[in-house]
């Protein structure tokens, strides 16, 4: 019944198996990829005909994580997989980027590649298996997929590179790098790094590239036995068409590329295109040529002009040399109500960035195959149509926006303080207000500025730069700080972000084969010099975090209570904690180890909540002194309320050393007095003294002592890297707590 073909190889100590012919047999191509207990189904479907009027290659990649693959039922009301998660979008892009450049340039059949995780093993990198599976499916499909791609993941632990590290190992790794490529060259790199050098990053790319060569051989073996006949392809346009356009319109195109302004240049090129269409109107009517062929030929001529000018004259569209960076302008504090803000402008690319602080309650909850976890740092990249002068409606975040936001997140995340140093959740919003290349790297620069303006104690400023490449045979030029046309007509988009001492994020997409490691090394070094220049310009505006937080930022304090008292603070059904939150207007976060974090808009609200928590959590000891309120006066003494919810009795003899005939002559209901706990009667009721409390307080200047340890006197509107939570018993700094938390508002 099944004509199954299976190929396997030992890869990094595990069996990698790729098979076809058993599942999804009606698709043009389908493979299952297995490693450990992970199983992925990767399919490819290619439309038989090209849609009328289409002028691009409609390739769609969808990566799906099925909840059942990890033995889970999806959350939410409908209990089924819905729209793609950010993780699924990011992996879909990871698959797309090395594969898309390898199709025949004239191929325009609608193509869908779907990779579904059917069984999930956290010890295997399913994103890497998805790239391998997609490449294998395409290799046996009718699509003109020109070269085979494979991928690997690289970690750096204890100074050693680790191939395909598990999620657990990645927690201690200095590097999380994905590299994909063909037998001859690297096609794509995506990474987050903890301030690694250019040389170390290049070593990691080489390590990953060499590691997946075994997988390419495996896919070739499968394709040799299982591949289907490929579509026969013709040239994108007749060479005679290009020659005729060159003869008639080359000078006009050259003049257009002398214009430095993006908008003016685009307008001129659009007019030239209309002239070309008018010239060939009869040929179009006679169906000798179509609009797309004419447009493609004109773009090829534009590319030749731009590329030759760079290679032969070392001059770019805007007049810069290959290493020049566009003019930079930085500004902070534009938005007075935001906790931090910055405007970063580089040439015709601009990013307006804001920083907002929140509490633990504001952390992003992420539901993944590994389980639910929380993200304390969030970065949202927004690319509105007006940034490129397009009249389009604003929509939900696109895949591109999700991908660019994650790249900027990777660049910033390694330099953020931990939760002990800075207890807030952080949201950065970067809106691209102008775009002409490298908007994601402008986001990185603007985010660094906004975080420092907000007072976040980051380890060092971060900047990003996008590098490009023009390569013809043995001649090549690496371009610093590319603009949009250089990205479009060039051969590489290579983004590098980092501090003055090392790289934090790297993303590389190559559009042609034959890029060797020498070129990558040159690009990395040129990017380092460009990054240092950008950091120098940024540092002129702000070079270190502000010592104080914005007046609009929430205040916070952390206290430590006995774990046995957590239930008393929460109360039945959360009654007590809700009452505290309502009366104080504060938010309270209680950890299982007894750490209580309190957040509010000002210190007065925090004090109200803190006093109420102390009142419940404190177990008074004999000899301690408290502030108390006279609740009731009797002939024999007075009842005193202290610590908010505790009562005691002061006998008339303990009120004063002087003789008192009538208690009401000395104390009245509502009076605030100092009291000292001197013992308990046989019913457990507290016995208090006023006279000794005042004696001890004045003689020893006794400070109230509670078994609640807090830093409530430490104002959070300052350099929060100096914030400490102390345990008075041993005077050691409390370590960061990573536990399940209980949240109340």
Swiss-Prot record:
One of its GO terms (biological process) is RNA processing. Mg(2+) binds at residues 487, 493. It catalyses: RNA(n+1) + phosphate = RNA(n) + a ribonucleoside 5'-diphosphate. Pfam families: KH_1, PNPase, RNase_PH, RNase_PH_C, S1. GO terms for molecular function: 3'-5'-RNA exonuclease activity; magnesium ion binding; polyribonucleotide nucleotidyltransferase activity; RNA binding. GO terms for cellular component: cytosol. The keyword Cytoplasm applies. Residues 693-732 are annotated as: Disordered. Its cofactor is Mg(2+). It is found in: Cytoplasm. InterPro entries: ExoRNase_PH_dom1 (IPR001247), ExoRNase_PH_dom2 (IPR015847), ExoRNase_PH_dom2_sf (IPR036345), KH_dom (IPR004087), KH_dom_type_1 (IPR004088), KH_dom_type_1_sf (IPR036612), NA-bd_OB-fold (IPR012340), PNPase (IPR012162). Its EC number is 2.7.7.8. Residues 554-613 form the KH domain. Keywords: Cytoplasm, Magnesium, Metal-binding, Nucleotidyltransferase, RNA-binding, Transferase. Belongs to the polyribonucleotide nucleotidyltransferase family. This is Polyribonucleotide nucleotidyltransferase. It comes from Rickettsia prowazekii (strain Madrid E).
